[in-house]
């Protein structure tokens, strides 16, 4: 467990309910299942003529993105709006911090807006934990991705995608392929799969993109794609982070695709009903060929749909946990 993850109890209130959502590390299986079940119940909201429920009416959700991500920000906005919350979205990367304002100063200014919840995305690992530790007690903090550390809502939407297509996790073989080293998605997926009882978790990639000691997550390591994909039920492709290419970790994108790109021929080594996932954005012809990304095995667009429901679940559960903690504190202060 890393020092960041050692702060995990911060996420729960005194009744064991979700209060912040910062990492999947150490969260009990029952809580992860509750998130998935709640998300399942929210899926039908998206099919309604009026796509709203009043659970967060009168609450303000502030999306604070120190790092750009149109997809994640948009799905959090939709999730909050469908819960009837008021939504503020700030691209802090182009505002105060670029003028020298510290994270702590930014936090204090955001608190002055009297928001009830912050969704935070930051390039530094641990940023969401820092904010959760220092924000006023009534505010919930959701991690929208922090450095290489965690992307817990992506992890849970991946789990919902798998569960809706494959049912139980107990008999599944899941392969995570690509840039494991820099991927917060890979870390969150590995933690969630292990907690939910998946017995066979594989990571596949070049040696230079696989972290030392990754076996502690309970995974099997493969550096040969064909061997790693043999008879798997689920293939999760990761974005090759091109900004890392300058570090000499890969000779070229073409070489990566030649050895680790998912093609129709290579996918044939997986089970006939295998599903293919990708957190996006996709680099076609680098991680995956278009015939696979758009083919019958792909559930990539389903992931986007399920992501809104998962984020609705997390927002509503965290707000409920904050309310319960506030009531608990008031009763015990009397």
UniProtKB/Swiss-Prot annotation:
Answer whether the UniProt record assigns the keyword tRNA processing to this protein. no
Family annotation (InterPro entries): Asp/Orn_carbamoyltranf_P-bd (IPR006132), Asp/Orn_carbamoylTrfase (IPR006130), Asp/Orn_carbamoylTrfase_sf (IPR036901), Asp_carbamoyltransf (IPR002082), Asp_carbamoyltransf_Asp/Orn-bd (IPR006131)
What GO biological process, any one, is recorded here?
Answer: 'de novo' UMP biosynthetic process
Pathway given for this chain reads: Pyrimidine metabolism; UMP biosynthesis via de novo pathway; (S)-dihydroorotate from bicarbonate: step 2/3
Q: Which domain of life is it from?
A: Bacteria
Q: Would you identify the family this protein belongs to, as annotated?
A: Belongs to the aspartate/ornithine carbamoyltransferase superfamily. ATCase family.
User: Entry's NCBIfam families?
Assistant: asp_carb_tr, PRK00856.1
Output this protein's name: Aspartate carbamoyltransferase catalytic subunit
**Organism expressing this protein natively:** Pseudomonas putida (strain GB-1)
Gene that encodes it: pyrB
